[in-house]
Regions:
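Substrate-binding cleft of carbohydrate-active enzyme catalytic domains
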Residues: 18-32
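Short glycine/proline-centered loop/turn elements that form peptide/ligand docking sites
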Residues: 33-37
Length: 170
């Protein structure tokens, strides 16, 4: 699942853990513990994970751990994103949460999906009705599945904003 490699032993271990937990009637969050935005590699991960774990009611899909340095439009709908690292600038296609959710649902999987807000899953003001003039903000549309859980990571070093208050407001 990483850099085009399948890591067979690792995947067997993940399968074993998921099967052991879900066979006991418990839940597992399959968390793509990545951040920034959903790349081609991460899209491929979800494509494969849905084939293996789709419709296992005990598996919850955590789409992207901590999105950051993107706006709500990119978060929801994807697009071309320019980034800079030690090698210079590059532009890459990133996938929006709605695109990945649609891919999962189009494969018939109804698993609950977790979507973190922006700025390391801290903010989710973009999900409020009326945000940016949009009737329902950037909320994800899940017409055929078991729903979306919105995830916030409340960090104490960001006192200027209270996501709990915003959650109640939205």
């Amino acid at each position: 699942w990483y850099q085009g490699k399948s890591y067979g032993d690792y995947r067997k271990m993940v399968d074993n853990v998921i099967n052991q937990i879900t066979s006991r009637g418990k839940y597992v969050i399959l968390n793509l513990h990545e951040f920034y935005a959903i790349t081609e590699q991460q899209k491929d991960f979800w494509n494969d994970a849905v084939e293996v774990y789709g419709n296992n009611p005990g598996v919850i899909f955590g789409l992207l751990n901590e999105p950051h340095d993107i706006d709500w439009e990119m978060w929801r709908n994807g697009g071309m994103l320019e980034t800079t690292d030690s090698y210079g600038k590059k532009t890459q296609r990133v996938y929006g949460h709605q695109e990945i959710l649609d891919m999962i649902r189009n494969k018939g999987a109804k698993n609950i999906v977790i979507a973190g807000g922006l700025d390391w899953s801290y903010y989710f003001d973009g999900l409020c009705d009326g945000y940016n003039g949009m009737e329902h903000g950037y909320k994800l549309e899940d017409k055929t599945g078991n729903g979306v859980i919105y995830d916030t990571h409340i960090y104490p070093m960001k006192p200027e904003y209270n996501p709990v208050e915003k959650a109640v407001e939205c």
